[in-house]
Amino acid sequence: MIKIMADSTCDLSDEVLKMYDISLAPLTINIEGKVYKDRVDIHPDEFYGMMEALPEFPTTGMPSPAEYQKIMNEAIEDGHKEIICICMSSGTSGAYQSAVLARDYFFEEYPNSNVKVHIVDSKSMSHGSGWLILKSALMRERGASFEEIVAFNEKYKTKVKHFLSVDDLDHLLKSGRLTNASAIIGKILMLKPIMSMKDGKGAIVGKERGLKRVLQHYTQEFIKRNDPKMTEFIILGYTSDHKVAENLKAKIQLDTDFKGDIHIMQMGVSVGTHVGLGAISMFFMEK
């Protein structure tokens, strides 16, 4: 059996992780000087409940090579001979490089090992890498080989389309995604920036006034960009407001001819630190 692993920014639900035996290397979150492991020491609902009251913005840190090594070693001890690790974009974090170092350390220690390890730089964030991970798990369950799953990821990883909008511009300002002037103008005009990924980095691709316009934007972009042969499922993400994601799901079902699964999953602490409360996202395969 092929082992699939990732980092905690993939934001897949606990149910999915358990169902497909996917292991995560946790990022760290520094909250008022105390360091937590994402999804180990702190969980999304707990974090979002305290977020507004925090006097300063939390910071995040990438998983260490040791975290990846631990998962790889456990997988090998369990009898896995093939390991695929799908990481958040190297353009936004050092997580990919940490995983590469962990793999290199393993083969330095065991140069004659017949274990296969492939590290994927997903060029994605949040449920974008999560989309690839879930697709890889489904391929594995259907009998795809290690080589076939690796080839799919490397060929199609840049086709995972991201859309993410935020409710609080201060988080994008703090993370360097907005200038101070843009944030001020956005607040005055009640504009919600819409972000996507370009060359493995986050970029603002649009602005809409009000949530209703945002959901309309998402639906129209899906109709225009979706590859019906490749989009087996859609993932919708949210930080604190599940109802908004449900509304977007209903709109997609009403306004488009998509008949596949639409998964709703909460964004985790690491991603939520940068996008804040009220964020909503959509992920699918584009043409």
Task: Annotate each PLM feature.
Residues 1-2, 80:
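Local beta-strand N-terminus motif with an aromatic residue
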Residues 3, 9-17, 22-23, 28, ...:
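Mixed-charge interfacial surface used for oligomerization/domain docking
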Residues 3-63, 67:
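N-terminal glycine-rich anion-binding loop in soluble enzyme alpha/beta folds
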Residues 53-104, 146, 150:
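Glycine-rich phosphate- or other oxyanion-binding loops that anchor nucleotides, phosphorylated ligands
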Residues 70, 115-116:
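Short amphipathic alpha-helical segments and their helix-coil junctions
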Residues 84-87, 117-121:
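Short acidic, glycine/Ser/Thr-rich loop/turn "cap" segments at secondary-structure junctions
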Residues 112:
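Flexible loop/hinge segments that line or gate small-molecule binding clefts
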